[in-house]
């Protein structure tokens, strides 16, 4: 009976020790107030070659400007400046993330394989 209690205690202790280190890997969604204009966007992507995890990034949102009654400035392309600004921010984010998420290898010059090359004769 005492042996069963000891084995159950050791099993529970082993499970507790295994669960505790992995609980820190779970992502928790923090709450942010809309008055700050910041929202935390959780991105969970892993590039296996570089072994990097991008856990989170801050993204500015213009929720306070969307409800205003001001007229939007329109450029010659027909898009408002706010839309163009959002598009340019998205492009910058993609460029910044490309170095972590890309699977591109450095370019290198390939040599022709050496087949049937005559071996130098030793004297």
From Swiss-Prot:
GO biological process, one term: cell differentiation
UniProt modified residues of type Hydroxyproline: 113
Residue stretch(es) of the prosequence: 30-103, 117-123
Keyword terms of this UniProt record: Differentiation, Growth factor, Hydroxylation, Secreted, Signal, Sulfation
Description of the deletion phenotype: Altered PIN2 traffic.
Miscellaneous notes: 'Golven' means irregular waves in Dutch.
Protein name: Protein GOLVEN 6
Modified residues (Sulfotyrosine): 105
Domain of life: Eukaryota
Residues passing through the membrane, by range: none
GO molecular function, one term: growth factor activity
Keyword set includes Transmembrane: no
Family: Belongs to the RGF family.
Region span, Disordered: 61-92
Tissue specificity remark: Expressed in roots, shoots, flowers and stamens.
Bias-annotated ranges (Polar residues): 61-78
Basic and acidic residues composition bias: residue spans: 79-92
Secretion signal span: 1-29
Cellular component terms per the entry's GO annotation: extracellular region
